[in-house]
Amino acid sequence: MIIGIGTDLCNIDRITTILGKKESGRFIKRLFSCEEIEASSAFSMTKAAFFAKRFAAKEAFVKALGTGFRHSISFQDISISNDSLGAPKVNISGKAALLLEEKKPPRHTLSIHLSLSDDHPWALAFVVIEACPE
Protein backbone atom coordinates (compact mmCIF):
# COMPACT_ATOMS: atom_id res chain seq x y z
CA MET A 1 0.00 0.00 0.00
CA ILE A 2 1.27 3.47 -0.89
CA ILE A 3 1.61 5.74 2.14
CA GLY A 4 2.76 8.78 0.20
CA ILE A 5 4.32 10.11 -3.00
CA GLY A 6 6.48 13.21 -3.29
CA THR A 7 8.45 14.90 -6.03
CA ASP A 8 10.62 18.00 -6.22
CA LEU A 9 12.67 19.96 -8.73
CA CYS A 10 15.73 21.99 -7.78
CA ASN A 11 17.53 24.43 -10.05
CA ILE A 12 21.22 23.45 -10.17
CA ASP A 13 22.23 27.00 -11.15
CA ARG A 14 20.62 28.29 -7.95
CA ILE A 15 22.80 25.92 -5.92
CA THR A 16 25.86 26.96 -7.97
CA THR A 17 25.18 30.59 -7.02
CA ILE A 18 24.83 29.69 -3.34
CA LEU A 19 28.05 27.64 -3.39
CA GLY A 20 29.87 30.65 -4.86
CA LYS A 21 29.08 32.81 -1.83
CA LYS A 22 31.46 33.01 1.11
CA GLU A 23 28.74 31.90 3.54
CA SER A 24 28.08 28.73 1.52
CA GLY A 25 29.66 26.59 4.25
CA ARG A 26 26.86 27.51 6.65
CA PHE A 27 24.25 26.62 4.01
CA ILE A 28 25.86 23.24 3.33
CA LYS A 29 26.25 22.34 7.03
CA ARG A 30 22.65 23.34 7.80
CA LEU A 31 21.10 21.29 4.99
CA PHE A 32 23.39 18.28 4.59
CA SER A 33 24.85 15.60 6.87
CA CYS A 34 28.59 15.09 7.34
CA GLU A 35 28.26 11.89 5.28
CA GLU A 36 26.60 13.76 2.42
CA ILE A 37 29.25 16.48 2.47
CA GLU A 38 32.03 13.88 2.47
CA ALA A 39 30.36 11.90 -0.35
CA SER A 40 30.14 15.02 -2.54
CA SER A 41 33.85 14.63 -3.33
CA ALA A 42 33.48 11.06 -4.58
CA PHE A 43 31.06 11.77 -7.42
CA SER A 44 32.05 12.91 -10.90
CA MET A 45 29.14 15.35 -11.18
CA THR A 46 29.56 18.94 -10.05
CA LYS A 47 29.06 19.67 -6.36
CA ALA A 48 26.09 21.85 -7.32
CA ALA A 49 24.35 18.96 -9.12
CA PHE A 50 25.19 16.60 -6.25
CA PHE A 51 23.71 18.91 -3.62
CA ALA A 52 20.74 19.94 -5.80
CA LYS A 53 19.68 16.29 -6.19
CA ARG A 54 19.95 15.69 -2.46
CA PHE A 55 18.07 18.89 -1.64
CA ALA A 56 15.29 17.81 -4.03
CA ALA A 57 15.27 14.34 -2.43
CA LYS A 58 14.76 15.78 1.05
CA GLU A 59 11.93 18.00 -0.19
CA ALA A 60 10.33 15.06 -2.03
CA PHE A 61 10.57 12.88 1.09
CA VAL A 62 8.75 15.36 3.36
CA LYS A 63 6.08 15.77 0.67
CA ALA A 64 5.63 11.98 0.57
CA LEU A 65 5.48 12.00 4.37
CA GLY A 66 2.72 14.60 4.09
CA THR A 67 4.25 17.09 6.50
CA GLY A 68 6.64 19.31 4.61
CA PHE A 69 9.31 20.75 6.90
CA ARG A 70 6.86 21.33 9.75
CA HIS A 71 6.60 19.55 13.07
CA SER A 72 10.28 20.27 13.86
CA ILE A 73 11.65 18.13 11.02
CA SER A 74 15.09 19.38 10.07
CA PHE A 75 17.14 18.82 6.93
CA GLN A 76 19.61 16.96 9.16
CA ASP A 77 16.90 14.36 9.95
CA ILE A 78 17.06 13.23 6.32
CA SER A 79 20.27 12.04 4.71
CA ILE A 80 20.70 10.70 1.19
CA SER A 81 23.32 8.03 0.50
CA ASN A 82 23.94 5.31 -2.07
CA ASP A 83 23.77 1.56 -1.64
CA SER A 84 26.53 -0.81 -2.78
CA LEU A 85 25.18 -0.74 -6.36
CA GLY A 86 24.98 3.06 -6.43
CA ALA A 87 21.21 3.38 -6.04
CA PRO A 88 20.20 6.36 -3.91
CA LYS A 89 18.52 5.72 -0.58
CA VAL A 90 16.87 7.81 2.12
CA ASN A 91 18.11 7.53 5.70
CA ILE A 92 15.97 9.17 8.37
CA SER A 93 16.36 9.95 12.04
CA GLY A 94 14.93 12.28 14.66
CA LYS A 95 11.49 13.77 14.17
CA ALA A 96 11.25 12.50 10.57
CA ALA A 97 11.65 8.91 11.78
CA LEU A 98 9.03 9.40 14.50
CA LEU A 99 6.50 10.87 12.07
CA LEU A 100 7.12 8.10 9.55
CA GLU A 101 6.59 5.47 12.24
CA GLU A 102 3.20 7.04 13.03
CA LYS A 103 2.16 6.44 9.40
CA LYS A 104 2.97 2.72 9.55
CA PRO A 105 -0.10 0.47 9.65
CA PRO A 106 -0.02 -2.36 12.23
CA ARG A 107 1.90 -5.47 11.13
CA HIS A 108 3.51 -3.69 8.17
CA THR A 109 7.04 -2.69 7.29
CA LEU A 110 7.85 0.54 5.51
CA SER A 111 10.07 1.03 2.47
CA ILE A 112 11.22 4.35 1.05
CA HIS A 113 11.88 4.31 -2.70
CA LEU A 114 13.93 7.17 -4.18
CA SER A 115 14.74 8.04 -7.77
CA LEU A 116 17.07 10.93 -8.68
CA SER A 117 17.80 12.47 -12.05
CA ASP A 118 19.28 15.63 -13.46
CA ASP A 119 19.38 17.42 -16.79
CA HIS A 120 21.00 20.81 -16.42
CA PRO A 121 19.70 23.09 -15.02
CA TRP A 122 17.24 20.80 -13.23
CA ALA A 123 17.65 18.13 -10.56
CA LEU A 124 14.63 15.90 -9.91
CA ALA A 125 13.73 13.62 -7.03
CA PHE A 126 10.79 11.24 -6.73
CA VAL A 127 9.93 9.43 -3.48
CA VAL A 128 7.39 6.71 -2.75
CA ILE A 129 6.76 5.52 0.80
CA GLU A 130 5.30 2.01 0.76
CA ALA A 131 3.85 -0.17 3.52
CA CYS A 132 4.06 -3.94 3.01
CA PRO A 133 2.45 -6.62 5.21
CA GLU A 134 4.94 -8.48 7.39
UniProtKB/Swiss-Prot annotation:
Signal peptide boundaries: none
EC number: 2.7.8.7
One GO-annotated biological process of the protein: fatty acid biosynthetic process
Major location category of this protein: cytoplasm
GO cellular component: cytoplasm
GO molecular function terms noted in the UniProt entry: holo-[acyl-carrier-protein] synthase activity; magnesium ion binding
Matches recorded under InterPro entries: 4-PPantetheinyl_Trfase_dom, 4-PPantetheinyl_Trfase_dom_sf, ACPS, Ppantetheine-prot_Trfase_dom
Cofactor(s) this protein cannot do without: Mg(2+)
Pfam families assigned to the protein according to its UniProt record, in alphabetical order: ACPS
Keyword match rRNA-binding: no
Compartment(s) where it occurs, according to its Swiss-Prot or TrEMBL record: Cytoplasm
Catalytic activity from the UniProt record: apo-[ACP] + CoA = holo-[ACP] + adenosine 3',5'-bisphosphate + H(+)
Alphabetical keyword list: Cytoplasm, Fatty acid biosynthesis, Fatty acid metabolism, Lipid biosynthesis, Lipid metabolism, Magnesium, Metal-binding, Transferase
Binding site for Mg(2+): 8, 59
Similarity comment: Belongs to the P-Pant transferase superfamily. AcpS family.
Protein role: Transfers the 4'-phosphopantetheine moiety from coenzyme A to a Ser of acyl-carrier-protein.
Protein name: Holo-[acyl-carrier-protein] synthase
Organism: Zymomonas mobilis subsp. mobilis (strain ATCC 31821 / ZM4 / CP4)
Taxonomic lineage from the root: Bacteria, Pseudomonadati, Pseudomonadota, Alphaproteobacteria, Sphingomonadales
